[in-house]
């Protein structure tokens, strides 16, 4: 229990030290702005809101198991939430560091300059800041494990703050706390200063960046423990702030400035306090730099992990660590040199980044997990109000503060602490006339005159202030009141740029010459102001530079005059070419967007084509088409990407800038109305800023999509390269194996090959059409369904006859293969003239039926045939197979064996008449069939199956039924062909898909088949004479042979038993089909003989 309480109080000490900072110096000033009662109430309210927001973070962390602020935001709102939190955290820490430097410059220069006998000048201040940052802040910040050394300073810093509070109390006693004079000099409730003080109060309690590290450091993390720790810490800090604010305001009343230590007289105690404050602030730097450096690291360098988290606390490389630390330390030092007073930077940072980090983001994160959270609603809306109203109030009220103090510093008016106090008092009294503080940004001329009187009354008091200051103050008052016509921001800039008149005119003209034509004079430019602004609303800005310039602009309009001009300069080069007749920039950008979006449809088209190519049963034509479609969109997408990026003009802004410079030189003398035009320009530019930011966001999203599309394109190009390599290897293997092509085989695919029958038919005919048409070896025929090649005409000749002969044939398959072929009626005419068919049979008696496969194209019908031609045709038919070469040749040999029976039948002779006339064409087309193989590279396995069917399908159905007295192995081959037909007509549900034998196995399977081919050719005439003598009705006595001892079918199975069972099933189906079709053909043959 004691250890737990000790660790708890240690954590409370750390939290209090992280909360209390230089903002305590501004508490008397805030009490002066709001009044004592209202100031105390606002402090209590901000303390409650800070506690609520800390609990929001703790509860969200316990639910989502995330332990970083950015991780919580990413979990709730994705990458946008993470970016918002990181940028806000960076801004808050940078603002705190700048505040530290301002305090060091104010207090340290007032302490060290008198010791060294120097005047408190700007040079002394800059030198002091550089020395402190180089010798104190930088070494502390470069330590990697700073927390151990920082904790040792926590107790010391708290002791110092306690001493500081007692000094404030003693000062109030000295200034008559009990005399009661202050009761009439102080104010109790002043609503005018609420929106100026609330952001300072909110930032004074800012500890959200320390919530999750503290939660992680607990031995037993729990929401209840965290709530008690932060409640105790915030109560201590609230009491401390109220005491310092009250006693400081009572001590100095209306003379209270933003840094209350400036008012203290120079004595050893106050000097010790000042030095102690400087040291505590310098030592507290690492507390601000640590989270700022981590946020910069994750924002700029760290990538998102696979689990969606970011390595926020990971190891940082030494070079990056040093570069980030140096950038933060010296960058904020420059800011401390440029911004002279504490309340300005504290108010602005608290109103913008402080409200986001302290109130808005925690409330949004908590609302994401808990829908009904009234406290989150309150915190959210108060934070939004601070963000909007307080930012405007702070900027409008303090616009003149940098002018006063910088001019005083440049002129050497800040002789010592007393002189600085008087200047501050004079400036504060100007801001605070009798209850007119809220109207500072819109004061009229009479209040300006009152200001004059007040200034003269209070500034003439100090001896150090020269007498020429009153006219200066008068001039400033007159100039600063001119924007009181409604806008406070632009005239501050005009005043700031006014002394060098020619330079001022050039700058303003650069910001105003939107239209760019040289003929236009400044007076007509006023009515045209709306036109460029309207165009500016529609024109999407450049994504990076524009957004970077707009973000600070939206946060504080008019805070930085150069930013408005910079935005104008970036906008105008885009608009000037429009007025001069050049192609406008805006359409270029809008045209580039379709180019940017183009890769997405292109990639979708490629995906669909590739899926079709992978899923298509015919592996030749769709794959080739997919190849063409895949290559073209890659190029077009690359062109569109290049077009989308090159669409942004690169050289035109240069020409526009030159044109603007010329116009600025021409119009340099026209100064009438330049300031009023600057005001109008800024108003109009601000009006279009929101829409321009939307365009920028949209453009960024499109660019992210482009990156994703490019990745997809790269992957698809790699896939295509792999496919091309496979294609080349296949072609080489085919060329090597062409020597061993003429190989017979009796392989039958198992029945029920798992492919759609209509697509099989189309695949069967595709090779023949392409092989017989050498002029179009690789192009798909337009009429073919699904982009496949149209079937050949010889298939059209066979199929109508087979409709009569085979009742088991699926009629739906026939139109798919031969619906668009011309000579479908040829076999019917031949059937009507059986004598002509018999003549053709006598003339082509030696014809090998293997020619029937691809010989039936229309050609001069009188060309005779010879066995040499038949052999050439057989070789040509075998070239159509790519992976299934062995099976193709085996089937052709089977068809040759079946041919003698076909020659003896009248009806079977009829197709030979057309085939006889086409032998020469088949010989020509034989060599051209080799290119067909290139199309099968995408899907080799299905292609082998389809070529198998293609080689055996037509002839076996017509000739096999009359195979009488065929030797057993030849009879088996005929049955194998019928089995192929049966397999295509009736897929067996029990059998799996048949795959082709790999190319490496072809030579082994093909050698015995080549011997069979030679044997079959030698016995061809003898078999035909024997078969011619048998009667048509006689069946072969050796039909019982089902399984031959040739090589097993090309079925990829794991054991011999499965292969035998597959072959048995095929043979059984083939036998049934052969008997059935034989009876039907015998009946039709008898009818024709009669």
From Swiss-Prot:
It is found in: Membrane. Residues 441-675, 729-831, 857-1037 are annotated as: Disordered. It comes from the Eukaryota. Facilitates bidirectional transport of amino acids. May act as a glutamate sensor that regulates glutamate-glutamine cycle and mTOR signaling in the brain. The transport mechanism remains to be elucidated. The modification Phosphoserine is found at residues 441, 608, 636, 887. Keywords: Amino-acid transport, Membrane, Phosphoprotein, Transmembrane, Transmembrane helix, Transport. The modification Phosphothreonine is found at residue 769. One of its GO terms (cellular component) is Golgi apparatus. Disulfide bonds: none annotated. Residues 441-454, 493-508, 517-528, 544-560, 587-596, 607-623, 654-665, 729-744, 758-767, 954-973, 1004-1013, 1026-1037 have a biased composition (Basic and acidic residues). Expressed in neurons, astrocytes and epithelial cells scattered throughout the central nervous system structures including striatum, ependyma, cerebral cortex, hippocampus, hypothalamus, thalamus, pons, and cerebellum (at protein level). Highly expressed in paraventricular hypothalamic nucleus, suprachiasmatic nucleus, anterior hypothalamic area central part, in lateral ventricule and in dorsal 3rd ventricule (at protein level). Expressed in choroid plexus epithelial cells (at protein level). Residues 923-936 have a biased composition (Polar residues). One of its GO terms (biological process) is bone development. The chain crosses the membrane at residues 9-31, 36-58, 84-104, 123-143, 153-173, 229-249, 272-292, 323-343, 345-365, 378-398. This is Solute carrier family 38 member 10. It is a multi-pass membrane protein. It catalyses: L-glutamate(out) = L-glutamate(in); L-glutamine(out) = L-glutamine(in); L-alanine(in) = L-alanine(out); L-serine(in) = L-serine(out). Belongs to the amino acid/polyamine transporter 2 family. The lineage of its organism: Eukaryota, Metazoa, Chordata, Craniata, Vertebrata.
